[in-house]
Amino acid sequence: MKRIGVLTSGGDSPGMNAAIRAVVRKAIFHDIEVYGIYHGYAGLISGHIEKLELGSVGDIIHRGGTKLYTARCPEFKDPEVRLKGIEQLKKHGIEGLVVIGGDGSYQGAKKLTEQGFPCVGVPGTIDNDIPGTDFTIGFDTALNTVIDAIDKIRDTATSHERTYVIEVMGRHAGDIALWAGLADGAETILIPEEEYDMEDVIARLKRGSERGKKHSIIVVAEGVGSAIDIGKHIEEATNFDTRVTVLGHVQRGGSPSAQDRVLASRLGARAVELLIAGKGGRCVGIQDNKLVDHDIIEALAQKHTIDKDMYQLSKELSI
């Protein structure tokens, strides 16, 4: 293999630049040329492809976002559109592709693989919802961003004796909410994977108030429903002074944590190794702190699951 491509797709996550850097430097170390594909699959279709050198990825390991930009490209689901992308890859002499992104990005890589073009997926999403890996690139940074925000909100919640409902990202996965809620001692954590009884939530808040608790923190993953509606329901049912904070896209930004930089470097380099070995159609991950790779088609057939023990622990510690 003499030439590979790399792209980032879907929602950005802190650490993507570190992964790009690792792909480029690992490949060049093995005398392989690297081409960056800008704006994800949309740039692949349009041919926005440029050669990357060592200097192209200098001074980016500590930067959030993605140097290659990103975009969503629903039209890539069309086989004819994907063929245009493959034509662009072949036009530039690219023999293998590293795709950094989340579930949708993996779906694109899977489809390209099924159409005969070797791809390796690298998990880049703050949601931590990709099967085949314990952690995704960006999750740790986003988690620390959320924890920092909740710490600050707790200060003002204490001062004003208020209940705060804090919405975090996670349409289908509650990892951010669960980990942040446990780390910050939230009174209640609501996630898409677990059903909840609003009356039970209210009863828990009332019990806390009866024993002298002056404030409460409720962490809600966006996939559960409207945090605003939940806040209104709580205030009406308890008469507690209640506020709602939606953290939004601040969770996707910022300089990546040390953990995300190291994880991205390891996974990006491993993706190149797989392409060199002729092992396309794979996705890389980290499990028990060891690098692993899986068939991308088989990985996508799996379902992300929440850590049930951690969820139970969060309930036991929030009594």
Curated annotation (Swiss-Prot):
The protein's annotated pathway: Carbohydrate degradation; glycolysis; D-glyceraldehyde 3-phosphate and glycerone phosphate from D-glucose: step 3/4
Gene3D superfamilies per the UniProt record, alphabetical: 3.40.50.450, Phosphofructokinase domain
Induction: By salt stress.
A single BP term in Gene Ontology: canonical glycolysis
Pfam families to which the protein is assigned, alphabetical: PFK
InterPro entries: ATP_PFK, ATP_PFK_prok-type, PFKA_ATP_prok, Phosphofructokinase_CS, Phosphofructokinase_dom, PKF_sf
Chain positions recorded as substrate binding sites: 125-127, 162, 169-171, 222, 243, 249-252
Residues that hold ADP according to the record: 21-25, 154, 185-187, 211, 213-215
Keyword Magnesium among UniProt keywords: yes
Gene Ontology CC: 6-phosphofructokinase complex
SUPFAM superfamilies from the UniProt entry: Phosphofructokinase (SSF53784)
Binding positions for ATP per the UniProt entry: 11, 72-73, 102-105
Similarity annotation: Belongs to the phosphofructokinase type A (PFKA) family. ATP-dependent PFK group I subfamily. Prokaryotic clade 'B1' sub-subfamily.
PANTHER family, sorted: ATP-DEPENDENT 6-PHOSPHOFRUCTOKINASE, PHOSPHOFRUCTOKINASE
NCBIfam families: PFKA_ATP, PRK03202.1
Assembly with partners or alone: Homotetramer.
Name of protein: ATP-dependent 6-phosphofructokinase
Taxonomic lineage: Bacteria, Bacillati, Bacillota, Bacilli, Bacillales
